[in-house]
């Protein structure tokens, strides 16, 4: 029987790191930069006003007070976007708007609040300080400076900076494209009437959500009955567009195990096809599989919903995030005090649904350990990680908890 650590290693080694691509800014949010970005121009691009007010020579406002304002004629209006470069003559003012280019010769901006707001002439009621309220070209970014770095997450602020620099695209590591397939002839689509012997299919919805939560993209979700031809048709249709295939169900030791049957058939054996089916010393999630379909990595998970989602967390989420260069590939591990005793099967690393109290530093096992009890997992915020050599855990014991929040 394979250990959890060994199976984690096998899955991680199979996953391929993404190669950088260039995408429009509108598609880059949340991705990781695949290279450094050098500023093609300075920011601000030109000296501009930080206030609505009047561009002046500071010396022309000497001694101005509310009681004794300095009167200056207004020679020009400069709105934001005006293209021609003006020159301010001595003992005059230009009315100027926020973001408008500062005229040559002006050394300060007097805010409109410190004036009478005149149009033809203006009463300056405050002595100007040289350089005040002028945004100098390059004070934020100098042209040629590396402003964004390889491995940096593309946040809204990063997109804003890129756009301000005139960049329409960014180099990024793309999202991994994942195909999710559920198997079982007993599965019915949610919202349709259940026939005798059927249950509603939940794994594809759940696993697709987990894929997106990990930062990847879902190529398609599909459901195959216990029919090798139907399962193979889904692979043939979608696998070419996927970087990873995840299946659930059909990997145990009984009859009608469609995933095992498919990869035992001549169509999916040899060449760049092949899946290794193993038992992993864990609960839930003992039956596992890993391999390739036409060169595309595939991870086959058990069909019970809790087993499928726990297996995703343990084996798929970390290398999936690593392949995309995303930070924090592993769920945070917390040390917490167990509030009630429990038992665990000998020889298996057990992951139990848990409620973690972050403030108190305590944890309690939540619900029965059976792999079909999805309700308890939906309400849990952690996974208790119990080593395979531990059989009994007393209340008060410190345990590791995977924080799912």
UniProtKB/Swiss-Prot annotation:
Catalyzes the insertion of molybdate into adenylated molybdopterin with the concomitant release of AMP. Binds 1 Mg(2+) ion per subunit. Pfam families: MoCF_biosynth, MoeA_C, MoeA_N. GO terms for biological process: Mo-molybdopterin cofactor biosynthetic process. GO terms for cellular component: cytoplasm; cytosol. Pathway: Cofactor biosynthesis; molybdopterin biosynthesis. InterPro entries: MoaB/Mog-like_dom_sf (IPR036425), MoaB/Mog_dom (IPR001453), MoeA-like (IPR038987), MoeA_C_domain_IV (IPR005111), MoeA_C_domain_IV_sf (IPR036688), MoeA_linker/N (IPR005110), MoeA_linker/N_sf (IPR036135). It comes from Mycobacterium tuberculosis (strain ATCC 25618 / H37Rv). Was identified as a high-confidence drug target. Keywords: Magnesium, Metal-binding, Molybdenum, Molybdenum cofactor biosynthesis, Transferase. CDD domains: MoeA. The keyword Transferase applies. Its EC number is 2.10.1.1. This is Molybdopterin molybdenumtransferase 2. SUPFAM superfamilies: MoeA C-terminal domain-like, MoeA N-terminal region -like, Molybdenum cofactor biosynthesis proteins. The keyword Transmembrane does not apply. It catalyses: adenylyl-molybdopterin + molybdate = Mo-molybdopterin + AMP + H(+). Its cofactor is Mg(2+). It comes from the Bacteria. Belongs to the MoeA family. GO terms for molecular function: metal ion binding; molybdopterin molybdotransferase activity.
